[in-house]
Amino acid sequence: MKLGAFLLLVSLITLSLEVQELQAAVRPLQLLGTCAELCRGDWDCGPEEQCVSIGCSHICTTN
């Protein structure tokens, strides 16, 4: 019985860690319903990128 309880505990901890990783990966997708101000001008973007307006959002994209 103790071995079964131990295996259950390890399984739950592993599942919890995997769920936390998935939540962290999904967070950027939450910007889809809101305005994302990721840049204010081309100077906020990388060397081969430019700041563009998409709806109410501003994001960096490659040329």
From Swiss-Prot:
Chain's role: May promote activation of the metalloproteinase MMP2.
Q: Which organism is the protein's source?
A: Mus musculus
Report the principal subcellular site.
Answer: secreted
Q: Which Gene Ontology BP terms does the record give?
A: response to lipopolysaccharide; response to tumor necrosis factor; white fat cell differentiation
Q: Which residues form the WAP domain?
A: 25-63
Q: Can you provide one Gene Ontology molecular function annotated for this UniProt record?
A: peptidase inhibitor activity
Membrane spanning residue stretches: none
Which keywords appear in this protein's UniProt record, sorted alphabetically?
Disulfide bond, Secreted, Signal
- Induction and repression of expression: Up-regulated by TNF-alpha and lipopolysaccharide (LPS) in vitro.
Q: Tell me the protein's name.
A: Protein Wfdc21
Q: Which GO terms describe its cellular component?
A: extracellular space
Q: Name one Pfam family in it.
A: WAP
Q: Kindly indicate whether the keyword ATP-binding belongs to this entry.
A: no
User: Would you indicate the residue range of the signal peptide?
Assistant: 1-24
InterPro entries, alphabetized: Elafin-like_sf (IPR036645), WAP_dom (IPR008197)
> Which domain of life does the UniProt lineage start with?
Eukaryota
Its tissue distribution reads: Predominantly expressed in white adipose tissue and liver.
Q: Coding gene?
A: Wfdc21
Q: Where in the cell is it found?
A: Secreted
Disulphide bridges? 35-56, 39-51, 45-60
Does this UniProt record's set of keywords contain Glycoprotein?
A: no
